[in-house]
Structure formats: C-alpha cells, structure tokens
Amino acid sequence: MKQIWQALKAHQQAVEHRGILDLFTDPRRAETFSTRLGDMLFDWSKTNIDHTARDLLIDLAGAAGVAEKREAMFSGEKINETEGRAVLHTALRNMDRPVQVDGVDVTPALRETHARMQAFVRDLRSGRFTGQGGPITDVVNIGIGGSDLGPAMACLALAPYADGPRCHFVSNVDGAHIHDTLQDLDPATTLVIVASKTFTTIETMTNAETAKRWMATRVSDPAAQFAAVSTAADRTAAFGIDASRVFGFEDWVGGRYSMWGPIGLALMIAIGPEAFDAFLAGGAEMDRHFREAPFAENLPVLLALVGLWHNQICGHATRAVLPYDQRLARLPAYLQQLEMESNGKRVAMDGHELTHHSGPIVWGEPGTNGQHAFYQLIHQGSRIVPCEFLVAREGHEPDLAHQHLLLVSNCLAQSEALLRGRSVEEARAVLAKKGLTGSELERQARHRVFPGNRPSTVLAYEKLTPATLGRIVALYEHRVFVEGVILGINSYDQWGVELGKELALALQPMLEGRAGTEGKDGSTAQLVAYLRS
C-alpha cells in the first residue's frame, strides 16, 4: 500500500496546477467519470482525478483489502475489533438473507421485531391504540446522537409521505428543547418514544423524566403513553413501560447506523410500514450494488475514493455536503455524525497512531441558502473546499415546478462556477460594460476574479422517495466503511465521546455547590465559580 500512496502523491503533485476544465477536452470525460445505479447518477468528472489517479485509487482499495473486509462485514464477522462486535446494520434491511453471529442466524429475531413494530404502528395509525384523551396526534422521540439524527433527518426528508401523527424530536439536555417541543402538544394524545439502548443515557433519561412529569399533568397513567427502544428490559419496566411497547436491537447495530430498525420507529409511525419497507428496500439495493459491482463501477467505493483523494492526497481538510433539496436540510448534520464519529480517529486498528490524517470535517447546508452565506469562501477563499451536491430531477410540488427548475439551475450553476471560475480578463469585460475604466476598473476586477478549478461532485436522482433516501443513506454508510478500511481505522467505535461524559458527572456537584474545585485547572475553576447555581 505504501507504494500506491506514494504514487498517488507523486501524481497529484505533477498535476495539481492542471485545470480540471482541461480534462474535458476528452469528449467522453463526463461519461467516463460518472456512475449510475437505477435512476441515480453520480458525476465525479469535475475533479482533478484522471485515468491514472483513478486506477491508482482502485488499486489502493484492492491492496487495503476492501473486498475481503466487505464480505467479513456482511458475513457477521467481528470487524469492530475494539469492542469485539460484528457490524450488521445491513441485516436490518436484508432480513430475508440468513446471517450468523456466533453461530446463530440473527434474521428470525430481526423479522420478529420488525413485525412487532409494524403491528404497533398499524394499531396506532388506525386508532386501535389511543392516548388517554383520544387517538394519538403527536409522537415525541427522545434520544440523542444516533437515536435522533437519523430518524429526524429521514422524517423531514420524507415529509410528503408523512400521513401519520406528527413527529417531533428532542435530543438536547438543555431544558429549552423539550419545553419548546411540548408546550403546544396535548399530553392526552401524545406518544413519547424513549430511544436509548441502555436506558441510561443521561440526556435522554433526563428528558424522559421531564416528559413523564408533563404527561402526568393530564393523564392518570403517564407510562401507558410511552414506548421504548432499548435492550434494558428491567429499566424500561421500572419506568413503567409495558413490554409490548419495548423494541430492542443488538449490540452489533451501532447507534449511528441504527435507523433501519427500532430506532426508526418514529419514522415508521410518520410514513407507515409500507413506505418504511420501501426505505429498507432502497438500502438493500445499495447493499447489493456495493457487494456485486466492480470497484470501477461501484458507487460507494468511488465516492470513498474521491473523498480520500481530496482529503489524503490533496490535503483538503473539509468537505461540504450541499443538498439542493430543502427536505434534506438535516442530511449534513446526519453525515457529520456518520462520518466524523466513525472516521475521526487518531489511532489505527493496530493500536498505533496514524501516520496520516483521519477523516475530514463534514459540514453543509441546503441550497440555495448556502449561496447567500458561505459560498463566498468556497468560490474565492484561500482554501479549497471540495463540494458534494445532491439534487433531484423532480420535486413533490407539481404546481411549483418552475421553482424546482430554478433550484436545479442554481445547483448546476454552482458546480460549473467552481469548475470554470472567472478570469481577470472576463472580469474586466464585465466591468467595462458597466462603464468602469482605468485604475478603478483594474482595482475592481481583482475582486471579481474567481479562481475556479475547485472540485465538486453531483449526486442526481429522480425524486426523493423512501427508496431513494434508503439508497442515499446506505451509499454514505458504505463510503464510511471503505474510507475506514483504507485508512486502517475502526469506523464502528466512538471512544472520543466518553471523556467529556465522565468530566461532566464530576462537575455537576461542583456547579451545585456541593463540592469544591480542587484539582481543576484555573480556567475551569473560574467558570464553575461564575456559573455555579
């Protein structure tokens, strides 16, 4: 692998001043550096990856053992080595294919849980399961991290399919979040879902207790309108939640990969079991493509290799995810956790510190909003930010098709502008038409130069349906896997979240005035004194 890394770096240094636009002298450039899956088109031709770089990157994936580790993951081997666990979120959307963990086929239990979820959701949506004041009108999902970001993102993304109760999401331990969410709801017609595998997550359980007290202001049996997504049956029972409304999932499903199963309960309630199954089917379709397509035609592999080229070879520390689809507004935040919690590591699988950078910083906002915020830096800033655009050919509002056309034209224009830029000669010509001359024209022209030659990709799809969203989410999940394998990282643990939790527990009695700040650094002690209740 070392030789391939070195060859990639040498090639990048040889071509880094080449214009990406120059690559389009090849009339087949766009076709050759694009990949399709059904109605999905991934165009990565507006990057500085040429045939040589592409071939080297594919060789890198082969040398890293991506194919072998891919099969190990799908087969239930314990590829999460630091925790001794399999990584089988894919089984949640492929329940008809037997998978063994420790010699036991896990799919019958998955099918049973899925059927229980469907039955509960159908009862709730039909009115057979009611609140103590009538049919359920609102559902509040209380969870954090993977118990929140995925289903919250998906519920917004699939709003046109949401014909069930209104779904709300509470994650932050800040009391303002649950207060603002509950204040306009009726406890007598609200279901609360507490999503915590261990039923001990401090933010989630604090909010759950608050919701229970709120529920008690209107109903005689608050726990009767609670459901739980948890494996801690003793704790859910102690909370008062009937076992029929408790849905568990195994430790081989990581939190940020879990919305395909019981963590997606709120999503299933919102869009119904049939649409939820279409979401699963979309993910399963991407799984099959990932397992079967050769690397040169494999969307997750190519998306990962493009990301590695930009981050590891070109040295671009961030990437912007820019969905030109307002209902994907929460996708960048979801991908922040998926990618940064998975591949934001400094230690390799073998326990040694990495000799290269780990994954990039992921951020973004939907278009066209971002154009009026941070695109200035993307176009004219001194650092290059690779951009990943997403756009649908068709919207859900036929009477507003003219607005969708404007949205799409803006997406394509931004991608083209990053590629082409604007030269000083072109800037002078524009200003001359406005009547500027002489030194003022020259001064202004320099501010209107766009360097261009900035890489971007476009993921285009027909329409944001449940199946399409499933394909998109699974695509990014597998991208994380491929990048992690090549970087030598365990993408499925998250020890970086632990230290802050431990310190917060120790700080709480200090802030309450029950303990002193001995042993704390001067800054922390000063802040405790200022913020002490």
UniProtKB/Swiss-Prot annotation:
GO molecular function, one term: glucose-6-phosphate isomerase activity
Keyword vocabulary terms for this entry: Cytoplasm, Gluconeogenesis, Glycolysis, Isomerase
Cellular component, GO, one term: cytosol
One of the protein's GO biological processes: glycolytic process
Reaction(s) catalysed by this chain's protein: alpha-D-glucose 6-phosphate = beta-D-fructose 6-phosphate
Cellular localisation: Cytoplasm
EC number(s) per entry: 5.3.1.9
Pathway: Carbohydrate biosynthesis; gluconeogenesis; Carbohydrate degradation; glycolysis; D-glyceraldehyde 3-phosphate and glycerone phosphate from D-glucose: step 2/4
Pfam families listed in its UniProt record: PGI (PF00342)
Family annotation (CDD domains): SIS_PGI_1, SIS_PGI_2
Alphabetized PROSITE patterns for the sequence: P_GLUCOSE_ISOMERASE_1, P_GLUCOSE_ISOMERASE_2, P_GLUCOSE_ISOMERASE_3
Coiled-coil regions, chain positions: none
Active-site positions on this chain: E341 (proton donor), H372, K501
Protein function: Catalyzes the reversible isomerization of glucose-6-phosphate to fructose-6-phosphate.
Recorded family membership: Belongs to the GPI family.
Record protein name field: Glucose-6-phosphate isomerase
Natural source organism: Cereibacter sphaeroides (strain ATCC 17029 / ATH 2.4.9)
Gene that encodes it: pgi
